[in-house]
Amino acid sequence: MIDLETLIHDALERNASDIHLTVGEPPIFRLDGELTNFGEVPLTEADTTAYVQELITPGLLKEFHEMGEADFAVTYHDLVRMRCNVFRQRGMTSLALRLLPLRIATAEELGLPPVVVAQADKPRGLVLVTGPTGSGKSSTLAALLDHINHSQRRHIITLEEPIEYLHASDQCIINQREVGADTGSFAAGLRAALRQDPDVILVGEMRDLETISTAITAAETGHLVFGTLHTKGAANTIDRIIDSFPAEQQNQIRIQLADVLECAVGQTLLPKIGGGRTAVFEIMVVTPAIRSMILQSKTFQIVSAIQTGKRYGMQLLDDALEDLVDRHVISLETALAAANEPDKFKTGRQT
């Protein structure tokens, strides 16, 4: 059996994002988005059980035995922060470990566009970061909160499941609350946050109607609210939010959203030529024109508004991909696989 510390050391040296530990398979790392075996010796049930016992608390171990799964985060030997999911499959124990650096990367290190960083300086409003699981949303939001923490005097409350990046208060007071351990749900924590004198609120997942509604209310009442959604692209985010509500409420939500939404950032991570990954962003800054489109149910026009809004820092995903291909950061094949309109993208490249 390979001890867990050795596994984690090797994963960090290879810049792995995840470790998968499953009975009957060798340890598997995710490197630049691809799964790669670490060694050839398959793990046994005794191995994976020992890994779980090294990481988990007694309370969560009880939950795992009762429910067949448990989700938590842990700082391991001052090496790394990990988001851990332990689960049963075919009656055996498996682990999925997401590796998170202890040091929060700066906005500059992540390559966040200036217009995205500028959202952290807004006094109020709703800022959304969207994308699939593993697209770097948590890193982006951590960098934005870190920017606020080192430049402004504000009270930040985060609601996360679990807490991923740990923030040490600098200029700000930061309270990080974990769903399950510190509050019952995102919606409950968000309702409570409104009574805790916050300036900035981070909602780790806007996954249900009540959480979305309360987040919009928090932005309406003068707070800067950051949230995430699993939508693809900034433009699709508006329809996703409005469609979450019953038909009789949609017009009111449309009015509220048009009033409070400041920016939506869609992002994904793609493999670079020569190794490593890079973030690609679609950015919608909510101008008066886009507010009008939201109010008038003309969200189908938003893509055109983004395309012509470069002076505001806006960009479509496909335009960002084209720039990366031109600069030889990613391959054309990678760009085509990620493009929203691959046929149009390919035709544009040929002409």
Where is each model-derived feature located?
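Short, flexible helix-loop junctions that flank or precede catalytic/ligand sites
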Residues: 1-351
